[in-house]
Amino acid sequence: MSVSKRSALGLVRTSVGEQAVWALVGEGSLRHMTASCITTLELEALPVDRAEVSSYVADVMSGLEAYSSRCAETPGGASWLYVQHVPVRRLITQLVRKLLALSAWPEFAAAPGPVALAPYEGLLGLRDSSSREYRAYTVTWSGVAYALGAQASHNPARSARLRQLTTLHPVRDLAHAPTPSAVSTAEVVALSWSSRHAQTLLPVLEQLAREGRPSVLVDLATDPMERCPTPAGGSITLCSAPLEALTAAGTVPGLHLDTEEPTGADGTVQVGVHTVRLDRLERLAAALLEGSGGCTQPSWRAVVRVEEWFLELLAAVRPHTVLLSNDTSPLGALAAHAAERHGATTVTVQHGAWIPEAVAWPALHSRHIVVMGDRDVAPAREWVRHPKAEIHVLGQPRFDALAGLGREAQHRYLQNLLGAGNESGPERIAVWACQPFGPQRLQAQADIILDGLRRARGRWGLVIAPHPAQGGRVFNRLLRRDGEPRMAVADPRVGARGCLAGADAVVSVSSTCGIEAVLLDVPVLELDRPGDRTLGLAEHAAAHRCRTAVDVAAALDLVSRGSARVPREACDAVCRWRGHSAADVAQLIIRRAEPDIAPTDLIDHQPAGAESGFPWGEGETIR
């Protein structure tokens, strides 16, 4: 989990001719400077206001939308900025954070001015991430200077590190993807490109199969560990998009990658004291979309080819419903647009907890939105884009498997990992449900957890459960530590879901596994460090809020004495789950496909056991 503490560049006040400028220079030269200077690493460590970042990001995206959204469209009519909104918005967020950090430095704030870039530095780069596939793109500091108007005659669009990355290739099975015309007709087409999607959607498709409703599950995962398992029975057809569609790379026709306005006067947007050129942002976005970063960040050319294949599939299968568990990232937004064009109803099932301040794009495009808990209704209502959208509180189909978990078997698995059961082994075991944060962030979280475990009464052990998208090697440095507490890393194929039922406590920052632990009545410690965003479980009295190691130790001591059960109302706020969410979603799909069901045929809150709009149990629909 180690990461370099050095910064390659620094910022120094200098002059070009008679004009004072802030120049990016090699960090080593700062030691001899008498003028105001700072390393870029120090700049990036300056605190910025989250709300201010979000507000400016929204302003920049609105400006870019007006300036450029129709410069490129798919053959099906989807704007490039609609489909690629999430990766572009994330890039803009990095830019805005750096601009606000620059303004937060007192020396620059006292004398703001133009920034001169570092020659030959790429304009786009990568941040450190523990994710196995996801690429954490960023705007370099030279890219920041470029966005503000600096000339970049000798700067490549991509950094050397980014240029060295090869296009991710899907597993070999995708090379034998069926032609759309070979797929039989079905009532529902579902799309998945991660294991969480598959775990959310497959239970629904299996329930539909029991009702005699055939479906097609399209697997778009480019990471072998994220592929869909082969469905049982013959009512669910599993197919994949062709290899060349998912890995295509190339320029974006219509976007100005090689040409720009001489002064950028045709479009600018303000970020505090900084004037950002929209033509430069368009060029940065075009460079970002040239390369394919897998199913989560497909190139523009990959998007166009996937759309063509998917529209052919819809024409052959003729479904009444397209089922998704993400309709905002590129493939999800594309599928929602294609489904609407085809005339199919769109249903999105929330597959993970929402943190309103941290969502990549606060938008939902589907006709029907299935959310987990009562607290998810308000953000869903704010984010819906469909003019006839309905919101349904039906829990989480992926959680239905919790009812059959073997607690004793999972507890034995944890004990075996830690060598528990002997005199020197731990008396109790905590599971840390990890997420693919950057190395420094994970290290800071680990320090608090381990210190808290050491301070707690009794002997606690820790099992680190990697996120499905996370590489296991990131934890090697932690495991080299000597002494207490005893630690181990769960098999990535097991993950937190495969062992949390056997834990004495679960530690989480914002993992959905924290919600699963609440539903299983396993005590949850919600790590609430400065700079981290949590699921807010503690706000509903569903978890112990832990800001420091002392808080962690105190919470573990409460667990040792026997924590009180989480009230039903608190559970429902987080996830209204009764063990049959998949059946409820399946019934929603069936009912909404029937032409005689009026859109006002809503489902109200009802006590358990009472008759409901869904024969399978409770639920609520909000328009």
Residue ranges and their predicted role:
Residues 1-623:
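Catalytic-core helical/loop segments in enzymes performing group transfer/polymerization on anionic/lipid-linked
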